[in-house]
Amino acid sequence: MAKSKVRIVFLCSSCGNEFAKWNGQCPSCSEWGTLSEYKVNTKSRTRSNGRPRSTTKMVDLLEKGKINRNNTGIPEVDRVLGGGILPGSMILLGGSPGVGKSTLALQIIPGLNSKVLYVSAEESEDQLALRAKRLGINSNLIHLSTENNAQVILDQVALLKPKLLILDSIQTIYSNNIDSIPGSPGQIRECGQQFLTMSKQNGVSVIVIGHVTKEGIIAGPKMLEHMVDTVLYLEGDPRFDHRVLRSEKNRFGTTNEVGIFQMSKQGLEEVSNPSELFLAERTKEVPGSAVFPALEGTRPILVEVQALVSNANFGTPQRNANGIDYKRLSMFLAVLEKRLGMVMGTKDVFVNLVGGLRISDPSADLAVITALASSAKDIIIPQDTVLVGEVGLVGEVRSVAKLDKRVAETEALGFKQIIVPQSNLKRFKKSNTKIKVLGVSSVKEVFSNLF
Protein backbone atom coordinates (compact mmCIF):
# COMPACT_ATOMS: atom_id res chain seq x y z
CA MET A 1 0.00 0.00 0.00
CA ALA A 2 1.30 3.44 -0.97
CA LYS A 3 2.40 5.53 1.98
CA SER A 4 1.29 9.13 2.31
CA LYS A 5 4.02 11.66 2.87
CA VAL A 6 4.41 15.43 2.94
CA ARG A 7 6.84 17.31 0.73
CA ILE A 8 7.66 21.00 0.46
CA VAL A 9 7.26 22.74 -2.90
CA PHE A 10 7.55 26.35 -4.01
CA LEU A 11 4.71 27.43 -6.30
CA CYS A 12 4.77 30.43 -8.62
CA SER A 13 1.60 32.53 -8.30
CA SER A 14 2.08 33.84 -11.84
CA CYS A 15 2.65 30.77 -14.02
CA GLY A 16 1.66 28.00 -11.59
CA ASN A 17 4.85 25.96 -11.95
CA GLU A 18 6.36 24.34 -8.85
CA PHE A 19 10.01 24.05 -7.83
CA ALA A 20 11.99 22.12 -5.24
CA LYS A 21 13.74 25.21 -3.86
CA TRP A 22 13.00 28.89 -3.47
CA ASN A 23 14.22 31.49 -5.97
CA GLY A 24 13.80 35.23 -5.98
CA GLN A 25 12.97 35.06 -9.68
CA CYS A 26 10.76 32.34 -11.15
CA PRO A 27 12.91 30.19 -13.49
CA SER A 28 9.88 29.60 -15.71
CA CYS A 29 8.17 32.98 -16.24
CA SER A 30 10.99 35.27 -14.93
CA GLU A 31 8.64 37.11 -12.54
CA TRP A 32 10.15 38.34 -9.26
CA GLY A 33 8.84 37.52 -5.78
CA THR A 34 6.11 35.11 -6.91
CA LEU A 35 7.32 31.84 -5.29
CA SER A 36 5.57 30.72 -2.09
CA GLU A 37 6.07 27.63 0.07
CA TYR A 38 3.40 24.90 0.21
CA LYS A 39 3.10 21.50 1.85
CA VAL A 40 1.78 18.80 -0.48
CA ASN A 41 0.46 15.42 0.63
CA THR A 42 1.64 12.82 -1.87
CA LYS A 43 1.87 9.09 -2.15
CA SER A 44 5.18 7.37 -2.66
CA ARG A 45 5.69 6.26 -6.22
CA THR A 46 5.18 2.55 -6.74
CA ARG A 47 4.77 0.48 -9.83
CA SER A 48 1.17 -0.15 -10.89
CA ASN A 49 -0.09 -3.70 -10.31
CA GLY A 50 -2.98 -3.25 -12.75
CA ARG A 51 -2.92 -3.48 -16.50
CA PRO A 52 -2.18 -0.27 -18.43
CA ARG A 53 -5.14 1.66 -19.78
CA SER A 54 -5.94 0.77 -23.38
CA THR A 55 -5.52 3.30 -26.18
CA THR A 56 -7.95 4.27 -28.93
CA LYS A 57 -7.32 4.75 -32.62
CA MET A 58 -8.26 8.21 -33.85
CA VAL A 59 -9.93 6.77 -36.96
CA ASP A 60 -12.36 4.84 -34.74
CA LEU A 61 -13.42 8.08 -33.06
CA LEU A 62 -13.86 9.83 -36.40
CA GLU A 63 -16.10 7.04 -37.67
CA LYS A 64 -18.49 7.65 -34.77
CA GLY A 65 -19.44 10.95 -36.33
CA LYS A 66 -19.78 14.43 -34.91
CA ILE A 67 -20.13 14.83 -31.14
CA ASN A 68 -23.33 16.70 -30.34
CA ARG A 69 -23.02 19.87 -28.29
CA ASN A 70 -25.51 20.73 -25.56
CA ASN A 71 -27.33 23.94 -26.43
CA THR A 72 -27.83 26.31 -23.51
CA GLY A 73 -31.04 27.80 -24.86
CA ILE A 74 -29.32 31.20 -24.92
CA PRO A 75 -28.15 31.91 -28.51
CA GLU A 76 -25.70 34.60 -27.37
CA VAL A 77 -23.91 32.09 -25.10
CA ASP A 78 -23.97 29.36 -27.74
CA ARG A 79 -22.47 31.81 -30.25
CA VAL A 80 -19.48 32.51 -27.99
CA LEU A 81 -18.98 28.82 -27.11
CA GLY A 82 -19.02 27.81 -30.78
CA GLY A 83 -22.42 26.11 -30.80
CA GLY A 84 -23.01 25.00 -27.22
CA ILE A 85 -21.30 23.17 -24.37
CA LEU A 86 -19.25 20.16 -25.43
CA PRO A 87 -19.62 17.08 -23.16
CA GLY A 88 -16.55 16.64 -20.97
CA SER A 89 -15.34 20.21 -21.49
CA MET A 90 -14.18 22.54 -18.73
CA ILE A 91 -15.11 26.22 -18.98
CA LEU A 92 -13.64 29.04 -16.89
CA LEU A 93 -15.98 32.04 -16.50
CA GLY A 94 -14.37 35.18 -15.09
CA GLY A 95 -15.59 38.67 -14.34
CA SER A 96 -15.55 41.47 -11.80
CA PRO A 97 -17.75 41.29 -8.67
CA GLY A 98 -21.43 41.97 -9.36
CA VAL A 99 -21.14 41.75 -13.14
CA GLY A 100 -23.51 38.76 -13.34
CA LYS A 101 -21.36 35.60 -13.48
CA SER A 102 -23.56 33.57 -11.14
CA THR A 103 -26.70 34.88 -12.80
CA LEU A 104 -25.48 33.79 -16.22
CA ALA A 105 -24.48 30.36 -14.91
CA LEU A 106 -27.96 29.84 -13.44
CA GLN A 107 -29.69 31.00 -16.62
CA ILE A 108 -27.78 28.43 -18.66
CA ILE A 109 -29.25 25.51 -16.69
CA PRO A 110 -32.90 25.37 -17.92
CA GLY A 111 -31.95 25.20 -21.60
CA LEU A 112 -29.75 22.13 -21.06
CA ASN A 113 -32.71 20.04 -19.81
CA SER A 114 -30.26 17.79 -17.97
CA LYS A 115 -29.30 17.07 -14.38
CA VAL A 116 -27.05 19.83 -13.01
CA LEU A 117 -25.11 20.13 -9.75
CA TYR A 118 -24.61 23.75 -8.69
CA VAL A 119 -21.97 24.13 -5.97
CA SER A 120 -21.70 27.48 -4.22
CA ALA A 121 -19.53 28.04 -1.17
CA GLU A 122 -20.36 31.76 -1.23
CA GLU A 123 -24.15 31.55 -0.77
CA SER A 124 -26.50 29.36 1.26
CA GLU A 125 -28.96 27.00 -0.40
CA ASP A 126 -31.84 29.33 0.53
CA GLN A 127 -30.07 32.29 -1.08
CA LEU A 128 -29.48 30.27 -4.25
CA ALA A 129 -33.13 29.21 -4.32
CA LEU A 130 -34.28 32.83 -3.97
CA ARG A 131 -31.96 33.90 -6.80
CA ALA A 132 -33.31 31.11 -9.02
CA LYS A 133 -36.90 32.10 -8.17
CA ARG A 134 -36.19 35.72 -9.12
CA LEU A 135 -34.84 34.53 -12.47
CA GLY A 136 -37.90 32.36 -13.05
CA ILE A 137 -35.92 29.11 -12.81
CA ASN A 138 -37.84 26.18 -11.31
CA SER A 139 -36.59 22.71 -12.23
CA ASN A 140 -36.29 19.41 -10.39
CA LEU A 141 -33.13 18.70 -12.41
CA ILE A 142 -31.12 21.27 -10.42
CA HIS A 143 -29.26 20.06 -7.33
CA LEU A 144 -27.71 22.61 -4.95
CA SER A 145 -24.70 22.18 -2.70
CA THR A 146 -22.78 24.53 -0.41
CA GLU A 147 -19.82 22.16 0.05
CA ASN A 148 -16.31 23.58 -0.37
CA ASN A 149 -14.24 20.39 -0.02
CA ALA A 150 -13.13 19.15 -3.44
CA GLN A 151 -13.17 15.47 -2.43
CA VAL A 152 -16.73 15.71 -1.10
CA ILE A 153 -17.89 17.51 -4.27
CA LEU A 154 -16.37 14.75 -6.40
CA ASP A 155 -18.27 12.19 -4.30
CA GLN A 156 -21.49 14.13 -4.91
CA VAL A 157 -20.81 14.08 -8.65
CA ALA A 158 -20.22 10.32 -8.55
CA LEU A 159 -23.54 9.86 -6.73
CA LEU A 160 -25.73 12.21 -8.81
CA LYS A 161 -24.02 11.69 -12.21
CA PRO A 162 -24.95 15.17 -13.52
CA LYS A 163 -24.32 16.34 -17.08
CA LEU A 164 -23.04 19.70 -15.83
CA LEU A 165 -21.16 20.77 -12.69
CA ILE A 166 -21.02 24.48 -11.78
CA LEU A 167 -18.41 25.60 -9.23
CA ASP A 168 -19.06 29.05 -7.74
CA SER A 169 -16.30 29.86 -7.20
CA ILE A 170 -12.98 28.01 -7.57
CA GLN A 171 -11.37 30.44 -5.08
CA THR A 172 -13.56 29.10 -2.24
CA ILE A 173 -12.87 25.37 -2.76
CA TYR A 174 -10.01 23.51 -1.10
CA SER A 175 -8.35 20.11 -1.32
CA ASN A 176 -6.96 18.06 1.58
CA ASN A 177 -3.88 17.37 -0.54
CA ILE A 178 -2.62 20.94 -0.11
CA ASP A 179 -1.78 22.49 3.25
CA SER A 180 -2.93 26.04 2.53
CA ILE A 181 -6.04 28.19 2.66
CA PRO A 182 -8.74 28.16 -0.09
CA GLY A 183 -7.96 30.57 -2.90
CA SER A 184 -4.19 30.17 -2.70
CA PRO A 185 -2.38 29.37 -5.98
CA GLY A 186 -1.63 25.83 -4.81
CA GLN A 187 -5.25 25.13 -3.89
CA ILE A 188 -6.61 26.56 -7.14
CA ARG A 189 -4.20 24.49 -9.21
CA GLU A 190 -4.83 21.26 -7.27
CA CYS A 191 -8.62 21.62 -7.28
CA GLY A 192 -8.62 22.58 -10.94
CA GLN A 193 -6.61 19.47 -11.81
CA GLN A 194 -8.95 17.19 -9.84
CA PHE A 195 -12.10 18.52 -11.51
CA LEU A 196 -10.44 18.44 -14.93
CA THR A 197 -9.56 14.76 -14.48
CA MET A 198 -13.11 13.95 -13.40
CA SER A 199 -14.55 15.89 -16.35
CA LYS A 200 -12.50 14.07 -18.98
CA GLN A 201 -12.97 10.60 -17.48
CA ASN A 202 -16.75 10.86 -16.98
CA GLY A 203 -17.85 13.22 -19.75
CA VAL A 204 -19.20 15.75 -17.24
CA SER A 205 -19.08 19.37 -18.40
CA VAL A 206 -17.73 21.77 -15.76
CA ILE A 207 -18.23 25.53 -15.50
CA VAL A 208 -15.75 27.10 -13.09
CA ILE A 209 -16.50 30.64 -11.95
CA GLY A 210 -13.43 32.69 -11.06
CA HIS A 211 -12.86 36.11 -9.54
CA VAL A 212 -10.69 38.67 -11.31
CA THR A 213 -7.97 40.89 -9.90
CA LYS A 214 -7.86 44.68 -10.12
CA GLU A 215 -5.76 44.24 -13.27
CA GLY A 216 -8.70 42.45 -14.92
CA ILE A 217 -7.20 38.93 -15.00
CA ILE A 218 -8.55 35.83 -13.29
CA ALA A 219 -7.13 35.42 -9.78
CA GLY A 220 -4.82 32.48 -9.21
CA PRO A 221 -2.07 30.81 -11.20
CA LYS A 222 -2.07 31.21 -14.97
CA MET A 223 -1.93 27.43 -15.18
CA LEU A 224 -5.68 27.30 -14.43
CA GLU A 225 -6.34 29.01 -17.76
CA HIS A 226 -4.01 26.53 -19.47
CA MET A 227 -5.90 23.58 -17.94
CA VAL A 228 -9.40 24.47 -19.08
CA ASP A 229 -10.79 24.18 -22.60
CA THR A 230 -12.50 27.57 -22.71
CA VAL A 231 -11.90 30.88 -20.94
CA LEU A 232 -14.81 33.34 -20.95
CA TYR A 233 -14.91 36.87 -19.56
CA LEU A 234 -18.16 38.63 -18.68
CA GLU A 235 -17.41 42.33 -18.93
CA GLY A 236 -19.41 45.40 -18.09
CA ASP A 237 -19.46 48.48 -15.93
CA PRO A 238 -21.93 48.10 -13.02
CA ARG A 239 -23.07 51.65 -13.81
CA PHE A 240 -24.41 50.45 -17.17
CA ASP A 241 -26.99 47.78 -17.93
CA HIS A 242 -25.28 45.99 -20.79
CA ARG A 243 -22.78 43.13 -20.47
CA VAL A 244 -20.37 41.66 -23.02
CA LEU A 245 -19.39 37.97 -22.98
CA ARG A 246 -16.01 37.38 -24.66
CA SER A 247 -13.99 34.26 -25.34
CA GLU A 248 -10.26 34.55 -24.61
CA LYS A 249 -9.58 30.87 -25.30
CA ASN A 250 -11.66 28.17 -26.98
CA ARG A 251 -10.29 24.80 -28.03
CA PHE A 252 -13.55 23.93 -29.78
CA GLY A 253 -14.44 27.18 -31.52
CA THR A 254 -13.45 30.71 -32.45
CA THR A 255 -12.35 33.36 -29.96
CA ASN A 256 -13.67 36.24 -32.06
CA GLU A 257 -17.36 36.00 -31.19
CA VAL A 258 -19.02 38.09 -28.47
CA GLY A 259 -22.40 37.92 -26.78
CA ILE A 260 -24.29 41.08 -25.83
CA PHE A 261 -26.67 41.13 -22.84
CA GLN A 262 -28.67 43.68 -20.90
CA MET A 263 -29.14 43.38 -17.15
CA SER A 264 -32.72 43.58 -15.91
CA LYS A 265 -34.82 42.41 -12.96
CA GLN A 266 -35.25 39.10 -14.78
CA GLY A 267 -31.49 38.63 -15.08
CA LEU A 268 -29.38 38.86 -18.21
CA GLU A 269 -31.46 39.37 -21.34
CA GLU A 270 -30.10 38.90 -24.86
CA VAL A 271 -29.68 41.93 -27.10
CA SER A 272 -30.65 40.87 -30.61
CA ASN A 273 -29.67 44.22 -32.17
CA PRO A 274 -26.67 45.68 -30.28
CA SER A 275 -26.30 48.57 -32.73
CA GLU A 276 -29.64 50.07 -31.70
CA LEU A 277 -28.64 49.71 -28.03
CA PHE A 278 -25.36 51.61 -28.39
CA LEU A 279 -26.81 54.36 -30.61
CA ALA A 280 -30.09 54.83 -28.73
CA GLU A 281 -29.00 57.99 -26.87
CA ARG A 282 -26.77 59.55 -29.52
CA THR A 283 -26.80 63.35 -29.35
CA LYS A 284 -27.36 65.07 -32.68
CA GLU A 285 -25.58 68.09 -34.15
CA VAL A 286 -22.58 68.03 -31.79
CA PRO A 287 -18.91 68.15 -32.92
CA GLY A 288 -16.67 65.24 -31.94
CA SER A 289 -19.17 62.42 -32.52
CA ALA A 290 -18.67 59.70 -35.14
CA VAL A 291 -20.08 56.23 -35.80
CA PHE A 292 -18.23 53.19 -37.10
CA PRO A 293 -19.24 49.56 -37.78
CA ALA A 294 -17.11 47.41 -35.49
CA LEU A 295 -16.83 43.72 -36.32
CA GLU A 296 -16.97 41.45 -33.28
CA GLY A 297 -16.47 37.94 -34.65
CA THR A 298 -18.93 37.64 -37.52
CA ARG A 299 -21.32 40.29 -36.20
CA PRO A 300 -21.11 43.98 -37.17
CA ILE A 301 -22.06 46.42 -34.40
CA LEU A 302 -22.44 50.15 -34.96
CA VAL A 303 -20.73 52.05 -32.15
CA GLU A 304 -20.47 55.76 -31.40
CA VAL A 305 -17.07 57.23 -30.60
CA GLN A 306 -16.89 60.62 -28.88
CA ALA A 307 -13.88 62.93 -28.78
CA LEU A 308 -13.24 66.14 -26.89
CA VAL A 309 -10.28 68.39 -27.69
CA SER A 310 -9.72 71.54 -25.61
CA ASN A 311 -6.91 73.89 -24.63
CA ALA A 312 -4.71 72.65 -21.77
CA ASN A 313 -4.91 75.41 -19.18
CA PHE A 314 -3.50 73.42 -16.25
CA GLY A 315 0.05 72.45 -17.13
CA THR A 316 0.74 69.15 -18.86
CA PRO A 317 -1.98 68.26 -21.43
CA GLN A 318 -4.19 65.35 -20.40
CA ARG A 319 -4.73 62.25 -22.54
CA ASN A 320 -7.59 59.90 -21.71
CA ALA A 321 -8.82 56.95 -23.78
CA ASN A 322 -11.77 54.77 -22.76
CA GLY A 323 -12.47 51.75 -24.94
CA ILE A 324 -9.48 52.11 -27.28
CA ASP A 325 -5.75 51.57 -26.93
CA TYR A 326 -4.01 54.59 -25.37
CA LYS A 327 -0.94 54.12 -27.60
CA ARG A 328 -3.17 54.19 -30.67
CA LEU A 329 -4.62 57.51 -29.51
CA SER A 330 -1.08 58.91 -29.31
CA MET A 331 -0.51 57.77 -32.90
CA PHE A 332 -3.68 59.54 -34.10
CA LEU A 333 -2.56 62.80 -32.50
CA ALA A 334 0.86 62.49 -34.16
CA VAL A 335 -0.76 61.88 -37.57
CA LEU A 336 -3.05 64.90 -37.15
CA GLU A 337 -0.13 67.15 -36.23
CA LYS A 338 2.42 65.86 -38.75
CA ARG A 339 0.25 65.14 -41.80
CA LEU A 340 -2.52 67.70 -41.39
CA GLY A 341 -0.79 70.55 -39.55
CA MET A 342 -3.16 70.52 -36.56
CA VAL A 343 -1.56 71.61 -33.28
CA MET A 344 -2.38 68.88 -30.74
CA GLY A 345 0.59 69.07 -28.34
CA THR A 346 -1.03 71.80 -26.23
CA LYS A 347 -4.50 70.24 -26.13
CA ASP A 348 -6.34 68.11 -23.61
CA VAL A 349 -7.70 65.09 -25.47
CA PHE A 350 -10.43 62.70 -24.35
CA VAL A 351 -11.81 59.75 -26.35
CA ASN A 352 -14.66 57.51 -25.25
CA LEU A 353 -16.57 54.61 -26.77
CA VAL A 354 -20.18 55.06 -25.69
CA GLY A 355 -21.60 52.44 -23.35
CA GLY A 356 -18.30 51.35 -21.83
CA LEU A 357 -17.37 49.13 -24.77
CA ARG A 358 -13.80 48.03 -25.44
CA ILE A 359 -12.84 47.64 -29.10
CA SER A 360 -9.55 46.36 -30.54
CA ASP A 361 -10.74 46.40 -34.17
CA PRO A 362 -8.38 48.72 -36.15
CA SER A 363 -11.27 49.60 -38.48
CA ALA A 364 -12.29 52.13 -35.80
CA ASP A 365 -9.22 54.27 -36.59
CA LEU A 366 -10.88 56.46 -39.22
CA ALA A 367 -13.87 57.25 -37.00
CA VAL A 368 -11.66 58.10 -34.01
CA ILE A 369 -9.28 60.39 -35.90
CA THR A 370 -12.20 62.10 -37.67
CA ALA A 371 -13.98 62.66 -34.34
CA LEU A 372 -10.77 64.22 -32.96
CA ALA A 373 -10.52 66.59 -35.92
CA SER A 374 -14.23 67.39 -35.67
CA SER A 375 -13.88 68.43 -32.03
CA ALA A 376 -10.66 70.37 -32.62
CA LYS A 377 -12.17 72.30 -35.57
CA ASP A 378 -15.62 72.52 -33.94
CA ILE A 379 -17.23 71.16 -37.10
CA ILE A 380 -20.09 68.64 -37.01
CA ILE A 381 -19.79 65.30 -38.81
CA PRO A 382 -23.02 64.63 -40.78
CA GLN A 383 -25.37 62.52 -38.65
CA ASP A 384 -26.19 60.18 -41.52
CA THR A 385 -22.52 59.29 -42.16
CA VAL A 386 -20.54 56.28 -40.93
CA LEU A 387 -16.76 55.86 -41.22
CA VAL A 388 -14.64 52.72 -41.35
CA GLY A 389 -10.96 52.15 -42.10
CA GLU A 390 -7.54 51.60 -40.57
CA VAL A 391 -5.22 54.62 -40.48
CA GLY A 392 -1.47 54.30 -41.10
CA LEU A 393 1.42 56.47 -39.95
CA VAL A 394 1.60 58.39 -43.22
CA GLY A 395 -2.11 59.20 -43.04
CA GLU A 396 -3.28 56.56 -45.51
CA VAL A 397 -6.60 54.73 -45.07
CA ARG A 398 -6.07 50.98 -45.28
CA SER A 399 -8.54 48.22 -46.14
CA VAL A 400 -10.69 46.36 -43.61
CA ALA A 401 -12.19 42.88 -43.52
CA LYS A 402 -15.80 41.93 -44.32
CA LEU A 403 -16.84 45.32 -45.67
CA ASP A 404 -20.08 43.91 -47.13
CA LYS A 405 -21.39 42.97 -43.67
CA ARG A 406 -20.46 46.37 -42.25
CA VAL A 407 -22.22 48.19 -45.09
CA ALA A 408 -25.33 46.01 -44.76
CA GLU A 409 -25.62 46.77 -41.02
CA THR A 410 -25.10 50.49 -41.69
CA GLU A 411 -27.84 50.53 -44.31
CA ALA A 412 -30.22 48.54 -42.10
CA LEU A 413 -30.07 51.25 -39.41
CA GLY A 414 -30.98 54.02 -41.85
CA PHE A 415 -27.64 55.75 -42.48
CA LYS A 416 -27.28 57.37 -45.90
CA GLN A 417 -23.49 57.35 -46.43
CA ILE A 418 -20.50 55.25 -45.42
CA ILE A 419 -16.89 56.30 -46.00
CA VAL A 420 -14.64 53.29 -46.67
CA PRO A 421 -11.05 52.62 -47.81
CA GLN A 422 -10.60 53.06 -51.56
CA SER A 423 -8.76 49.73 -51.76
CA ASN A 424 -11.87 47.90 -50.53
CA LEU A 425 -14.00 49.14 -53.43
CA LYS A 426 -12.12 46.94 -55.90
CA ARG A 427 -13.86 43.89 -54.43
CA PHE A 428 -17.08 45.53 -53.26
CA LYS A 429 -20.25 45.42 -55.38
CA LYS A 430 -22.11 48.72 -55.00
CA SER A 431 -25.08 47.34 -56.92
CA ASN A 432 -26.01 45.26 -53.88
CA THR A 433 -26.74 48.30 -51.70
CA LYS A 434 -28.69 51.55 -51.88
CA ILE A 435 -26.49 53.44 -49.41
CA LYS A 436 -23.86 55.86 -50.77
CA VAL A 437 -20.42 54.25 -50.50
CA LEU A 438 -17.55 56.76 -50.72
CA GLY A 439 -14.00 55.47 -51.13
CA VAL A 440 -11.03 57.42 -49.75
CA SER A 441 -7.31 56.75 -49.74
CA SER A 442 -6.09 59.21 -47.08
CA VAL A 443 -7.24 61.04 -43.97
CA LYS A 444 -6.76 64.35 -45.79
CA GLU A 445 -9.26 63.20 -48.42
CA VAL A 446 -11.79 62.35 -45.71
CA PHE A 447 -11.50 65.80 -44.15
CA SER A 448 -11.88 67.53 -47.52
CA ASN A 449 -15.18 65.68 -48.05
CA LEU A 450 -16.57 66.28 -44.55
CA PHE A 451 -15.08 69.59 -43.44
Enumerate the predicted regions with their spans.
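Conserved Rossmann-like nucleotide-cofactor binding loop
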Residues: S124
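Conserved SAM-binding strand-loop segment of SAM-dependent methyltransferases
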Residues: L144-S145
